[in-house]
């Protein structure tokens, strides 16, 4: 409307005419009779149809009012509206923002046609990878020691040995002298390209493993059959045969002579002995198998606890997906050629708004960047096709300088070798009940370690430039933020404000279909140009995306190779940043609409973003529908679509949820949610369903505790597993929802009961000692009470730090009201008269640290630990305990000497031992 002549679209009708009124989204009648003193309530679809009539009437030419009125009457034969009334409503739509700007632009584009093609995105994309240009690292001229020379020869002999096999994880740290010799040898080995440097890293790691005595992983990865098991099974078969022979002999049907070992026995006696021998061998096999499995799971837990947790969660299903269907399914997603709508009006406006942004400074990768990035990466995460763990990048410091130079060379060239961005995607079954269908597998991509290093550095450089442009609503990336917890705090603040002030609040949850797999590469390149990312990085990333490909694997078997032509990787630091940059313009567009919910302190919140999880806020049904349509238009133009079955809308009037018919979209309908909806894992309705959340978290926590206690982990590892596997279920909602003290105490008591049921805790042992650290003589368990208190305190501290600069968190702090509840300082277990007696007795005569080292190093079962600690705490059922604690006995004196009380100290003292020995003799 801004391009039309102002005198032809009056701001309001003449005084004698009835003025139109908007009533988008409100109940209305369908009649169009206008009488003096009445108003017509326009539907959203009618407003859209009216704008279509307006733009199709060519409003820049004379006589457009008659043409618009004629088109309106053709569509609505029974309408009695006059041309001036239609023009007034058009003006009303713009002035009162009855439709969002994106909806108006979409209608305008639809009526005017595509017009002139939009400009092409400058991607600086080369059609194919260029030959790798080399950078020769300077060679050290220092004289090598004999050990370094020997290592150099071994490394040179292993370079370019194919195929690569997975490298083993180290169970101990190599000596400093060995690593110094290896780094000295590396300085004397020249490499020209990053490919050669990668070969050098792999060869060096292989040689180090060989020197340390690790066996190569060549050959089959199948589990070897233990020799002891083979021998025992052979003995069991022989014993079964003997039992069968004895049974036949007892019936008189055996023609062969008796086995030699039973020749001097009667047949019934020999049969009984054979059966007992068979039972003993079977029990031995069962015991050995159980003990061997216990050793295996404890070794695995010591190095890869996540694998143990995955097994407990049922993610070890070995069913292979169908090869052909899986290949077709993922190629249909990733190899789909997709592009964004470069002619969208909102994008044209966005380009104009961003035309004067300064370009990012030139990027140079330094040795300090390499060291900083490597220090923040995990040592033993699953490697990509290069089979190199991050640990070796940390230890082989001699290659850092050449890596930095060779990465800079790649940036200048604008491309890289194809292997650098190749990945291997492991397909893991989601729900075993759905079977081996391709859509029931979750893809986990492992990328080359060198690429993860380089992409992480590039992501850090881009983040530094984008920090001034990224929306505050996006908390999926960024530093110094609590991420999902921050979004939940904001959401909790809005919901509580609505309930307390009885205001109107409309919310909507938006979910994308295959969000990470559907964002076009052209849109990513467009956004990098939009925010004026350094042109060298733009060219490199654009060319890199053309080379993305991965090999699908299931249960260690390769299925197919797929090119990533649409979507992003989910295995490096750069891809999430690119995805968030691709959604960042949506925040700017939503903010421009002016819609949102106004808090008590005047702060306005219109939307929240956590990666692809979007939540919209508005004060009226009309406004929330406009935000939904705005988001839909944006998503459609960039090539992404809603997953309507997971989207939802909720309308709250005066603090109470009401039912409406939802909102209609071209793809379908977004239904209203009345009961609950999970946002970032927290159930929601009119605010938070706190009781339901607490119940669900507690039930899942106790279920995981049972899984841990049923396992064959040693006592120390069970405590670690409960702390790191079960307690996070409680920690996540803590600080967001209130947790009554009674429920916290009940959950801790339930945990202690489960420990007692599985033999890991004596019924009358000290619960305080259960939660003390193992260095101090405790069991190292963390209580639910301490977990909730710790997380709540951290959240409160975070709110206080951010409140001065964040108006929403400032209101959240005002709602919080009460200060942190500090843990009550009660007596420690050492001060208890009975439980702390042993500790007090040895404090003066023994080294406490060494006295409790067995709790950390012995590797005992939890039942054994519980028994030893119960004895130290006087918790065994002696006569003194029965008389003084249980009150089931009157005489606490020792049953042997009849003099001193029968305590644990008395039983183990020299007098008790002497009395016992005298009686037994």
Where are these regions (language model features)?
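Short, conserved micro-motifs composed of acidic
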Residues: 8, 12-13, 556, 628, ...
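Trihelical helix-turn-helix/Myb-like DNA-binding core that engages the DNA major groove
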Residues: 40-41, 56-103
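Surface polyanion/phosphate-binding segment centered on an Asp-His-Pro turn
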Residues: 132-248, 698-705
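Helix/loop segments that flank and initiate small ligand/metal-binding modules
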Residues: 731, 773-774, 782-783, 821-901
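Basic, alpha-helical interaction scaffolds
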Residues: 667-741, 759, 794-809
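Catalytic palm active-site di-aspartate
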Residues: 201, 330, 384, 422-425, ...
């Amino acid at each position: 409307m801004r391009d039309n002549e102002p005198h032809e679209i009056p701001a309001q009708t003449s005084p004698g005419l009835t003025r139109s009124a908007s009533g988008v989204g409100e109940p209305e009648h369908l009649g169009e009779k206008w009488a003096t003193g009445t108003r017509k309530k326009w539907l959203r679809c009618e407003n859209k149809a009216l704008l279509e009539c307006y733009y199709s009437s060519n409003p820049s030419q004379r006589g457009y009012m008659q043409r618009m009125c004629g088109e309106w009457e053709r569509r609505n034969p029974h309408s009695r509206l006059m041309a001036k009334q239609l023009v007034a409503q058009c003006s009303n739509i713009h002035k009162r923002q009855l439709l969002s700007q994106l909806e108006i632009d979409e209608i305008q584009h639809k009526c005017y046609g595509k017009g002139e093609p939009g400009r092409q995105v400058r991607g600086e994309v080369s059609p194919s990878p260029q030959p790798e240009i080399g950078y020769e690292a300077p060679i050290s001229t220092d004289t090598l020691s004999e050990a370094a020379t020997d290592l150099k020869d071994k490394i040179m002999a292993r370079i370019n040995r194919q195929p690569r096999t997975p490298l083993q994880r180290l169970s101990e740290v190599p000596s400093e002298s060995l690593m110094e010799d290896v780094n000295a040898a590396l300085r004397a080995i020249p490499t020209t390209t990053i490919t050669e440097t990668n070969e050098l890293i792999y060869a060096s790691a292989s040689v180090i493993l060989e020197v340390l005595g690790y066996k190569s992983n060549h050959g089959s990865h199948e589990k070897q059959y233990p020799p002891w098991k083979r021998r025992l099974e052979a003995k069991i078969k022989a014993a079964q045969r003997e039992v069968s022979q004895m049974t036949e002999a007892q019936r008189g049907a055996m023609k062969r002579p008796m086995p030699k070992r039973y020749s001097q026995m009667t047949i019934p006696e020999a049969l009984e002995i054979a059966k007992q021998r068979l039972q003993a061998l079977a029990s031995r096999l069962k015991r050995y198998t159980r003990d061997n499995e216990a050793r295996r799971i404890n070794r695995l837990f010591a190095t890869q606890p996540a694998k143990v947790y995955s097994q407990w969660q049922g993610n070890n299903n070995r069913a292979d997906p169908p090869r052909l269907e899986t290949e077709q399914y993922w190629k249909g997603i990733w190899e789909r050629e997709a592009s964004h709508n470069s002619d969208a009006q909102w994008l044209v406006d966005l380009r104009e708004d961003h035309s004067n942004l300064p370009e990012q400074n030139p990027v140079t990768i330094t040795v300090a960047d390499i060291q900083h990035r490597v220090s923040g990466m995990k040592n033993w995460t699953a490697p990509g096709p290069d089979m190199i763990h991050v640990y070796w990048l940390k230890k082989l410091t001699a290659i850092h300088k050449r890596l930095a130079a060779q990465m800079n060379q790649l940036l200048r060239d604008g491309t890289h070798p194809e292997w650098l961005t190749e990945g291997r995607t492991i397909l893991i079954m989601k729900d075993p009940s759905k079977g081996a269908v391709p859509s029931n597998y979750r893809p986990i991509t492992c990328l080359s370690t060198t690429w993860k290093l380089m992409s992480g550095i590039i992501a850090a450089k881009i983040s530094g430039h984008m920090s001034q442009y990224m929306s505050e609503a996006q908390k999926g990336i960024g530093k110094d933020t609590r991420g999902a917890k921050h979004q939940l705090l904001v959401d909790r603040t809005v919901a509580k404000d609505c309930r307390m002030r009885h205001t109107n609040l409309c919310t909507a949850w938006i979910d994308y279909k295959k969000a990470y797999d559907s964002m076009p590469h052209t849109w990513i390149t467009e956004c990098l140009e939009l925010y004026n990312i350094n042109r060298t990085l733009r060219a490199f990333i654009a060319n890199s995306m053309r080379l993305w490909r991965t090999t699908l694997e299931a249960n260690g078997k390769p299925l197919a190779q797929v090119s990533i032509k649409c979507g992003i990787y989910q295995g490096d630091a750069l891809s999430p940043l690119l995805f968030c940059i691709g959604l960042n313009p949506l925040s700017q567009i939503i903010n421009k609409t002016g819609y949102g919910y106004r808090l008590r302190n005047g702060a306005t919140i219109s939307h929240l973003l956590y990666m692809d999880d979007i939540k919209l806020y508005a004060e009226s049904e009309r406004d929330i529908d406009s935000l939904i349509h705005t988001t839909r238009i944006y998503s459609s133009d960039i090539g992404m679509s809603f997953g309507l079955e997971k989207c939802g809308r909720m309308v709250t009037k005066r603090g109470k949820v009401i039912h409406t018919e939802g909102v209609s979209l071209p793809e379908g309908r977004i239904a209203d949610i009345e009961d609950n909806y999970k946002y970032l894992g927290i159930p929601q309705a009119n605010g938070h369903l706190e009781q339901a959340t607490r119940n669900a978290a507690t039930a899942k926590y106790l279920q995981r505790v049972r899984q841990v206690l049923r396992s064959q982990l040693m006592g120390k590892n069970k405590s670690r597993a409960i702390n790191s596997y079960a307690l996070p279920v409680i920690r996540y909602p803590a600080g967001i929802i209130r947790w009554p003290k009674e429920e916290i105490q009940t959950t801790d008591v339930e945990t202690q009961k489960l420990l007692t049921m599985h033999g890991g805790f004596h019924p009358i042992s000290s619960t305080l000692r259960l939660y003390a650290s193992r260095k101090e003589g405790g069991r190292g368990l963390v209580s639910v009470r301490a977990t909730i208190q710790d997380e709540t305190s951290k959240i409160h501290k975070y709110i206080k730090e951010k409140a001065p600069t964040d108006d929403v968190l400032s209101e959240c702090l005002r709602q919080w009201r009460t200060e942190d509840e500090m843990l009550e300082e009660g007596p420690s277990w050492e001060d208890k008269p009975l439980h702390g007696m042993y500790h007090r007795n040895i404090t003066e005569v023994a080294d406490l640290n060494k006295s409790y080292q067995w709790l950390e190093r012995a590797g005992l079962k939890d039942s054994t630990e519980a028994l030893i600690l119960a004895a130290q705490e006087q918790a065994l059922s002696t006569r003194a305990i029965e008389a003084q604690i249980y009150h089931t006995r009157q005489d606490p004196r020792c049953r042997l000497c009849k003099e001193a009380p029968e305590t644990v100290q008395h039983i183990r003292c020299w007098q008790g031992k002497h009395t016992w020995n005298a009686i037994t003799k």
